[in-house]
Amino acid sequence: MARPYAKRSLAGAAMLVLSTLSVRAQQPARPPQASCEKLTPPSTHVSPTAADPKDVASQDAIIAALYDVISGPACQARDWDRFRSLVVPGARLIPTGFTSGKAVTRVMTPDEYATASGANLERNGFFEKEISRTGETFGAVTHAFSTYESRRKANDEKPFARGINSIQLSNDGTRWWIVTVYWQGERPDSPIPAQYLKPPAN
């Protein structure tokens, strides 16, 4: 996820994906900022938005929707209502990283994440892609370990960051929900283990 936990984050050079805090696994150089017309800030305290059935029909679909909704070129507003439609009431987004050698986390609501990360995602451009996933399911409870790459432009040759999203999901019998997204960026002293870089089976 884009991470509003650092002065420079996955979401912008200051995080999903932390944009105002100091937890950043890798600190990429601040990208040139696009000259955008004023974008509408994310709304808060809105009525729940009905999900697109295609977004919540399967585990694959809801994880794909999560990555898609935060991704886009510079100056393109993100659909935060769609983002909210993916998560349960009370969902949490939890970026983690290290400052002064100590692990630090920040627990956010979906609205807090949208407010913290939205401007940087939209100003700088941000594309996050899943490259590997492992998971387990018991009854209605599913845990997915989703490895990601982050780019400023969709066609950038190399990602500026990688990491793992630990995604907790629930299936209520009619649709899938995201309960928690807890993530950490890769660091030079903490590379992603090989078992979490295996491409998905076809």
Residue map of PLM features:
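Surface-exposed, charged secondary-structure patches
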Residues: 28-29, 92-93, 97-156
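Bacterial N-terminal signal peptides
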Residues: 11-20
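Short beta-strand edge/turn micro-motifs at domain boundaries
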Residues: 28-40, 162-192
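Sec/Tat signal peptide C-region and signal peptidase I cleavage site
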Residues: 21-25
